[in-house]
Structures are given as structure tokens and as C-alpha cells.
Amino acid sequence: MRTALKNAFTFAALAVALSLQGCGKEEPPKPAPKVEAPPPAAAGPKTLKMQSSWPAGLTLQDNFRFFAERVDKLTSGQLKIDALAAGQVVPAFEVLDATHKKVLDGAHSVTYYWIGKNKAATLFASTPAGPFGMDTMDFMGWVYEGGGLELWWDFYQKELKLNVIAFPILPSGPQAFGWFKRPIKSLADFKGMKCRQTGIVAEIFQKMGMQTVNMPGGEIVPSAQRGVIDCAEWVGGIEDLRLGLPQVWKYHYTPGMHEPSIVGELIINADVWKALPAQQQEAIRSAVTETFTRWWVKWQKQNADAIVEMRTKYGTQILRTPPEILIAFLKAWDEIAKEESAKNPFFKKVLDSQREYASKVVPAKRFMFPPYSFAANYYWPEAKPAAKDEGKKK
């Protein structure tokens, strides 16, 4: 009996010991519950600060604003353009350098303002006669189908060493010959006149005997009112009306051969461009193309209305530019182009590219397209000049 109790006690003690040993042993930690990572926060709308070279009241600035509106809609508000007018951040002629330095994200201007850096700049805006007879659509064909856009970007990035890209956006041609304080009938009438001209056009007029001065559009009318200049070229039509030119001079000559196919540009800092998502880049490309077309067709109607207002409200005399002056202008341009090509390889490269493209499309277009004046004169014959008073009864 005693032995049985002793064995039972021993067994019980062993069981308790084993039980206590098990309680003292740590269990392996249970894995932490899986927590789903929060979705990445959606990026908020991005705003690009851009400035133009134009006064706020001009339709050139309307082009810029329309572009900004289209980008906003095409990106569902995710990319916005702050389309500032000339002088709101930097002076009108400093927008290119400001974009390169990222003071601005972009700019709305025209390349011939930069001929002080390299005269090839004028070839991406407009040259006399197109060049080589090209109109605006031919020029755009060269840009997109003839290698022009690649040369344009090379001009900025390789020739000028600027960190920018550009797109054609502003078709403000063909442009009128200009405004004068007195009638002009020949080259001799240029002598002694000081005229606001810009870019390579100023050099051409200098060859033709005119004194020239460059200034932003907003300074033209005040300079005319002070008698600092005797004539000026701006754009023509609605732009000249809004600028106030009919209020200072009465003699307006058209057409001109200096900017028949002028195209302004949208400049964007290259780093800003690369940082944009692909969809926003495509939205900008699409908005540029739409702005070019929609603004241009509206502008033609505005120009027609402006011509009527110039005549009826301000008594403007809208006169035909003497052919002698236009031919002299083209000859002077050919001389300058030849001289510049001899010393500027990139100028020659671009001009040769334009000549090659024009050699195909201009003769073909002349063959296929009737002269604009043919049907225009049939339906809307020009009024003949009033007869002189020689036969007047005494």
C-alpha cells in the first residue's frame, strides 16, 4: 500500500514538473496581420508658368489663351498653362533666355526676335517670299514633312546651346507692308525715314535706304506720337487696329513680301517637357495644332472687319505696295541670304532644306491652284481709282 502511494505521488510530481516546464516555454510569435499599402495619392493639377512677347490686348495673346484653355480641357484639368502677357515676368524680348534658365516654364513668341544670337533664327519664323514662294501651309509642310521641326530643335539645343524645344503655333501672315506718315511711290521715298522694323527685315530695309529701329509692339504707337519714327511694320488688320496704328498714321500699304508665311512659336523648357507624362505631352501637341488652325480662320474674319473699320472710322487709306519696292525687297533679301550662307553653315543648311522642299511643292501648287485673284476679281472686282480732276468742268 505504502509502495503504491509512493509511486502515485512520484508520478503526480513528475506530471506537475512537466506541466510547469511546458508553461515556461515561449511559443513562436504569430505572424503580424497583413496590412495593405495605401494607394498612391493622385497627383494634383500642375501649372506651367509661361509668358508671351505680346501686349495683353492683342489677338496674338488670344492665340496663347486659347492654347491654355485647350490644354486644360484635354488633360481634364491636370495640366494648366498660366498664359501671361509681355512684361508680367520678364521683358518681351527676354522670354527665350528666361525659359532656358527656367525662370519661365515656357514662352509664346517668334524666332526672328533672336537673330542677334544667330541669323538662322529668321528661317523658323518667316523669310521674304516664304521663302522661295511658299505660303503658310507650305511652310508648315516643311516643318512637319520636310525635316523642319528637327532642325528647329537642333537650332536651339545644338547651335544656341539652350535647353528648350519649340512648336509652331501662331500663323500671323501674310503681313501688310506697313504704315507711313506720308505716301510712298518708289524707293526714293524711303530716304530720311526712320521705321520700326525687326529681325532680318530691318537689315533688308537698311539695304534699301531706310533707317530702322527695333522695339516691342507696345512701344510703336507712343514712339510714333512723339515723332521718333515715321513708319512701322507690325502685322496688319486686327492687330494693327488694336495696337492703335490707324490713330497715328493714315497711309497703310499692303501686301508685303517680308513675312508672307510668318509663324510664331511655343517654347518649352526641355526639362519641363521631359518631366511631363506622355499623355500631357500629347495633349500639348494636339492643342498646338488645334490652336494654329482655329485661331487662324477666326483671325482672317477679324482682319476683314478691321479693314472696314480702318477706312470708315479712321479714314485710313489702304494702298497697294508699288511692285518696284517688292521686287527690290526680294533682291535685297537674296543678297543677304547669300552672304549669310557663306559664313553661317547652319543658316545654309536650313535654307537649303527649305529650297529643296519648295522646289517640289511650289511649282506643283502653282499648277494645281488657281490664282486667288482670279475668282476674287470675278465676284468682287476692285474699285478703280477715282478719275483725276483734269476733265472737270470750269
Model-derived regions: residue spans:
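Extended rod-forming repeat segments used as scaffolds/tethers
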Residues: 13-14, 384
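Core domains of carbohydrate- and sulfate-ester-processing enzymes
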Residues: 146-151
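Bacterial N-terminal signal peptides that target proteins for export
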Residues: 1-12
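N-terminal secretory/targeting leader peptides
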Residues: 23-139, 155-394
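Bacterial Sec-type N-terminal signal peptides, specifically the leucine/valine-rich hydrophobic h-region
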Residues: 17-20
